[in-house]
Amino acid sequence: IFRIFATMQVLRLWFFWVCSLHFITTPMLVKTHAIVLRSLKYGDNQLITDLLTEAFGRVSFVSSIPRTQKAKIKKQLFQPLTLLEIEFDHRPTARLQRLRDARMTYPFTSIPYSEAKLAIALFVAEFLSHATRDEQQNVSLYKYVETSVRWLDGAQHAFANFHLAFMIRLSRFLGFYPNLNDYTRGCLFDLRSGCFVASIPMHNDYLQPDDAAQMANLMRITPQTMHLFGFSHHERNRCTQLAINFYRLHIPNFPELKSFDVLRAVYGE
C-alpha cells in the first residue's frame, strides 16, 4: 500500500510539472500598443526591433524584412518613435518575440518632414532605448511617452526644448525625479540624491551653482511653458548634457548618446 501511495504521489507531481511546463512554453496571443525605439538589420533578411509596449514594457522582436509592397508588415513601420498596434505570440522564455502583425495607429504629420523634429525624435528614441532597457510593464510611463510623441508631432512652434522637458519628467516614472523644494539661489545640486544642497557633499557627483540653477530651470519646463525658456544654443546643449549625466548616475551602463551630436549640429553649438 505504501508503494502504491508513493507511486501515486510521484505521478501527481509529474502531472503538475508537465502542466506547468506546458503553461510556460505555450505562447499566448497578445495585442498591444507599442512605440518603436530602434531597429537593426540582422543577417540578409531579418530585422531586430526594440519596442516599448504597453502590456509588457520593453520587448525585442525579430521579423523578416519585407521584399514587396504587398507584405503584411512593412519596414517603414519601424522608424524611431512610430506608434503601433502589434500582435504577437508571447513566449515568456524567448529572448526575441516574433511579430504576427503590426499597424500604425498615429501617422506622423510633421516629424519625418522637419529636420529639427527628426533630430529630436532620433535623440529621444536613443535615450529611451537606454533609459527603459530593463523596464517591465508600466502603463503610466507608456502613456506619458505616447502622449509626448503626439505632442511633438502636433507642435507648430516652440518645441526646441521638448527633449529637455521629456527627459527630466520621465525620471518621475523611473523613480529618481529630482527634488526642487530645497532650491535656493547659489546652492549646489547633488546628482546622487537628486536634491539641492547648501554644502559640498562627500563625493564629486554634484553641480556647481550655475549648473544647479539650470537643473532647477529644467524641472520647471512643461510642454505648456517651454516657450517661455529662451535658452541659447550653448545653454540648451549644456542642459542636455546635464540631464544625460544625471541619468548615467542612476541607470547602470547608461552611455553617451550618439544622436546628441546630430542634435547639436541641427541646433548649433
Predicted regions located by residue number:
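Non-catalytic alpha-helical scaffolds and adjoining flexible linkers that form interface surfaces
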Residues: 23-269
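Tryptophan (W) side chains
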Residues: 14-17
